[in-house]
Structure formats: C-alpha cells, structure tokens
Amino acid sequence: MSEQIPKTQKAVVFDTNGGQLVYKDYPVPTPKPNELLIHVKYSGVCHTDLHARKGDWPLATKLPLVGGHEGAGVVVGMGENVKGWKIGDFAGIKWLNGSCMSCEFCQQGAEPNCGEADLSGYTHDGSFEQYATADAVQAAKIPAGTDLANVAPILCAGVTVYKALKTADLAAGQWVAISGAGGGLGSLAVQYARAMGLRVVAIDGGDEKGEFVKSLGAEAYVDFTKDKDIVEAVKKATDGGPHGAINVSVSEKAIDQSVEYVRPLGKVVLVGLPAHAKVTAPVFDAVVKSIEIKGSYVGNRKDTAEAIDFFSRGLIKCPIKIVGLSDLPEVFKLMEEGKILGRYVLDTSK
C-alpha cells in the first residue's frame, strides 16, 4: 500500500545566506517526469551544508534553500519517465542531484563535473526536509533492509573519501596520511583506507580524537596540538613520508604541510574546501620529488555503488550521533567550533 503524501512537511529553511535557520512547515515538492519523490528518514550533516548556509563559496545557492545532501529514505512517488525504481525502494539523495548526461564529462562517467550539474542542498532543495526530490538516474540505490541512519553519511562523506582514495591510486601496504581524521569525512576515510589495505597515519588534534581514530584502524596518530613540527612527525611515523595524503580538513596550513611531508612520487589529494584557500607548493621540491597534487570531487554512480557495497559488507562503520532535524542549528554551531567526532545524523521525524 502506497504512502499517503501530505501537502506540507517539516523542513529547515533559510531565506538569505547567513540568515536564520527556521524549522517550519514547507510545501512537499512534486517530482518532475525524471524524478523520484523520497520520504527522507535520516540525513547526514556535511561541512558543505555550512558553506551553503554562509554563502562563502564562489557558487551561488538558490534562495530560499533547504540544505542537506546525505538523505536516506524510501521512494514514495515518481515522475512518468522514471525507470528502474518502484515505490518502497530505499533511495539516497547525494550531492549530485542531477546532470545533463550528454556532455563530454557525463559521457565519460564524470557527471559531477557537468556544467549543468544540479546540486542537492545548494541549487536544489536537499535532505533537511521530510520529502525531497532527486533525479532517478543519479539517486543512490540502497539495498533493502539497510539501516538508513547509518548509511546516510556514506552518500556524501563515504563516497567522497572513497573516490579520493581511488584518485590517490595507492597500493596495498602503502602509507596514506589523512588530515582531519577525527571528523565526519576523516573517520570514514580511515576505514575505507584500511579496507583497501592501506596503512594510515591520522592527523588531528587532541587525545580524544587520537583514541577515536586508532579505534577505527589508524596505525599512527599525529596530534597537531602537541607536535611542534607536523611535517617531521608525519615523516617519522611513516618511515620517510606517506605515499599519499588525503586532505579532508578545512585547514589551508594542513594542505601546505601535506605537500611537504609526502615522500618522493607521493600524491596529494585535495578534498576539503576551506573558503578562499590556496595551495602553496615550492616548485623546486615538487619537481625534484615528482609529486602529484590532485583535486578529487564527489564520486560518480559507480563510485557510489562501490562505497555503499563496502558499507553493506560490514567493512565500514559510521560513527554517528542521531539528533532531531530541529536541532540542526546546534549541529552547525558544534561544526564551526570543531567539536564533532564522527558524523551527526538528523532524524527528520523530530
């Protein structure tokens, strides 16, 4: 029996960038011919959502806006052109809500780089609401019976770090440094790296985060609040420097340090997006060491399916804390203060 779809729902909305977050009644969207209507049960909270709210990236958001792009829920409606889905399927709302599927980037599986990409919680109302729409081609298929609260962070954080590790192209047994390892992306990056056979040196601040990342499989921990020379500490922990570095923190300094501590032929992958930041790399050292500096955006449909498969096989545990949708302003506050361990997940029924 299909679900009765209401006319209005609860959502967290802001009318201006930097404006007040309001938990209020909001219209339930009608899916376009190519879209699913998903009853969002849970949504992760990503640092990108904070940037969308502030409007501090060089890409304009829609306004008013419902943020969120880690929504896990159930298909309750669909447009007439949708194929491959049925009512009752578990579905995920990702950062990439839709793309043109005809440009050179879409044709080579690089849909996130599409010039017409529609972004959940940025240019398209996202998952901080009870009912949301998503392009049926890009929506993530979630296996039946999956714990929707726990899988929610995989839809962005998990896919993003998994793609970054693939971009680093490291071999099993090699070292990878993960900066910001105790946060939402970092805690998943540690686990995906271990599941891929890599040795992990985690970088973050404080004893609590050190214990946390080691419990997830990090072999070594460098504490930026205690180690005076981060570059040397990382090199020492990895016998000369890691073979790759995944920068998920929003620290420009951490990015610059990663260029210094990777060993010759090392690969520096940029994931976190600190506002207005630049990468500074000594050209002589970069050439002589033959290092690579790469950007890694979110994954495509194949990356998403693979990242969810790692989770479904029990190789990835999402360290989550569940709070109500109405608690989003407090979660943003904790995020700005750097006080989040793991990932916050919002229960849209509260």
Swiss-Prot record:
Transmembrane segments: none annotated. GO terms for cellular component: cytoplasm. SMART domains: PKS_ER (SM00829). Belongs to the zinc-containing alcohol dehydrogenase family. Zn(2+) 2 binds at residues 100, 103, 106, 114. Zn(2+) 1 binds at residues 46, 69, 156. The keyword Manganese does not apply. It comes from the Eukaryota. Its EC number is 1.1.1.1. It is found in: Cytoplasm. Homotetramer. Keywords: Allergen, Cytoplasm, Metal-binding, NAD, Oxidoreductase, Zinc. Binds 2 Zn(2+) ions per subunit. InterPro entries: ADH-like_C, ADH-like_N, ADH_Zn_CS, GroES-like_sf, NAD(P)-bd_dom_sf, PKS_ER. NAD(+) binds at residues 180-186, 204, 209, 271-273, 343. It comes from Candida albicans (Yeast). GO terms for molecular function: alcohol dehydrogenase (NAD+) activity; zinc ion binding. Gene3D superfamilies: Medium-chain alcohol dehydrogenases, catalytic domain, NAD(P)-binding Rossmann-like Domain. It catalyses: a primary alcohol + NAD(+) = an aldehyde + NADH + H(+); a secondary alcohol + NAD(+) = a ketone + NADH + H(+). This is Alcohol dehydrogenase 1. The keyword Mitochondrion does not apply. Pfam families: ADH_N (PF08240), ADH_zinc_N (PF00107). Its cofactor is Zn(2+).
